[in-house]
Amino acid sequence: MKLHRWNEIAEEHLNPSLERRAIHTDRLTIARLNLKQGCVVPNHWHENEQVSTVEQGRLKFVYPGGAIEVGAGESLEIPSGVAHEVIALEDSVVLDIFAPRREDWVSGDDAYLRR
């Protein structure tokens, strides 16, 4: 077992409105992201299943055929391969869990987040 403390994990400043801390295990990634109001995570998809739990604020997830708002205390399940865009309607903190782990984040091949 290994104990992780969020405040001891290096924070990545991906762009002026998005910051991330991440833990990568052999089989999953868990990340805590801070999004400033107005932040847009551009439309993208990945093979990973994703569960996003909003801890603070409100996010709008836009996907083919619709959109859904997720607020504090709510979780959204995003199946593998589903394209989605995220818009921060308020300053927000979200906990994202991915399986399998985000190899693109491990390797730094996540340019869509760094715009």
Residue ranges and their predicted role:
Residues 1-27, 31, 107-115:
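A short, N-terminal "cap"/entry segment at the start of jelly-roll beta-barrel domains
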Residues 26, 62-66, 89:
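Short strand-coil-strand connectors
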Residues 31-45:
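Conserved short histidine dyad/triad with adjacent acidic residue
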Residues 35, 46-61:
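Short, conserved beta-strand element in jelly-roll/cupin
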Residues 55, 71-72, 90:
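A cytosolic small-molecule/anion-sensing beta-strand core signal
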Residues 65-80:
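Short acidic-glycine-tyrosine-enriched beta hairpin
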Residues 80-104:
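Ligand-binding loop in jelly-roll beta-barrel domains
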